[in-house]
UniProtKB/Swiss-Prot annotation:
InterPro entries recorded: Arrestin-like_C, Arrestin-like_N
Domain of life of the organism encoding this protein: Eukaryota
GO biological process per UniProt: meiotic cell cycle; sporulation resulting in formation of a cellular spore
Keyword Ribonucleoprotein among UniProt keywords: no
UniProt gene name: SPO23
Quaternary context: Interacts with SPO1 in meiosis.
Keywords: Meiosis, Sporulation
Record's function text: Regulates expression of PIS1.
Name used for this protein in its record: Sporulation protein 23
Amino acid sequence: MLFSSSSSSLNSEVSQVFSENISSRSTTLTESSTQSEIRQHFGNEDFSGELPKKLIQLKKLKNGGTTIKKAKEDLEYCYDSLRLYENPYVTSSVDKKCGYSIELYLDNKYKTLMFSDLQLNADYPLYYDSSLDNISTNVERERATPLQIKGKIRINIDREDQALLITSHSISLKCFTKEYACFVNSETSKNSYSDKIIKELNHTEFFESSTYPKQQLRVIHHSLNDKKILLTKGTYDYPFTFTLQANTFPASFSSFFGKTHFRIESLTTIMRIPSKPKNLLKFLKNESFTDKIILTEEIKVKRVLPSTSMLKFETFQLRSYNTASEIVVSVIGNSKLIEIGMPFQMILSITKTDSSIELQEASLAVAQRMAIPSIDLKTKKILREPYIKKSEYLLRTVESQSFDSDKTIFGFCFDDVVIPTYADGLPSWFKTFYCEPSSFYPNHAALKVTHLLLFRITYSRNELVEGLEMKKNYRITVNFPILVGDSDISTSSLLPKYEKFENISDLQDEPPLYSMVAGENSL
């Protein structure tokens, strides 16, 4: 990689010995390379053949939580990336005493990656139920356009009497995950909560999965086996590029049943050179002058619907009734896709054939089903029925005063039903659709979040019970599976904004004169 620097105050002979030009580095992650990384990191539980690992907290490091002083080259430093309080994102390290700074630069456009590869399976869409099995290869993901992350590491040395020796320098894209499962004692009753334990799944007993990356992609600018690079006063840029193919990384997610999290991590190992070292060879062997600088930035990965998906424009209609067909409920929805913060339309029709029936209330809610694998506590095998956490969020109610007892047909049109944004009060437990493969159980999902629209109609009628007339309450529930996403879910299907021409002169068949173009450029 080529880099520029200002004039050096050190001996030119020393500079020639330790300086070299390094070409620009980039790397591409494919499905095969991802699996290779998984085998590399979790192939042996005791991590034989790898460096011993030391657990650290970034917030306790020097220079604003970035620098390990007197770092050991025979140790690999790990931190729990999902504990943001202990390990916050820090993108710059400044050492005023030694006169240098290191910064991680990443444009905002690279901080969120959106793959248009959310394949829902046309025959039986994934969002229809909470089943975790038969998660097949996603063909749509394989066709999606690769995405890139571009950035640079800038090293700046301010002082004439100081210099740095770069012994190693790399940039990594790391994926950290937490997977959970419900361990069930199959010999006892299935309804006994005391025999169900939800635990985190780990690849190794020594470290939590969130401490060591599930997958990572690395660009190495300089390794320990290379010659050391001498940097004197000046500014040095190290650009990097990651190219990500679809179907390699899971999407970002955070809940009490599972997490997936990404970081860009810059790792630079330096040796601080004093202004007048008495013995250069002795100095180079002295590890007390070695520092390791860790810089990190958050990356989000999203899956959105491909441009070929028409789910947003698909309507649905369904009908339900009680056993005696005394109450008939019809529901029409304008879309099978509901975006958080965007209004949608629902039409409710209720018909009663028995005038003695009294309608009490109607409600519309969105139900969430969050499923994780169920594991037999003894055999450790995955069970067919997953553990499902059920929750509901009420959207709209119709009170009893809206039902005239003399009528037999009631119609309600909800034009502005909205699942609010988190800023407007949506609880944090509510999540959008999510389904990603498990690292532990092939062809099964690690976590699946699905949703239903629930219409509930409560009514009462008088009945004879042991010769006495009593009022009994009943309920009819109409539900329909929907896909809930955020504002980006249908980005790929949006058409360019229509701009109306003001007059016919806006439509020009002939190009402008060269003299006019030249005149504009000369201004």
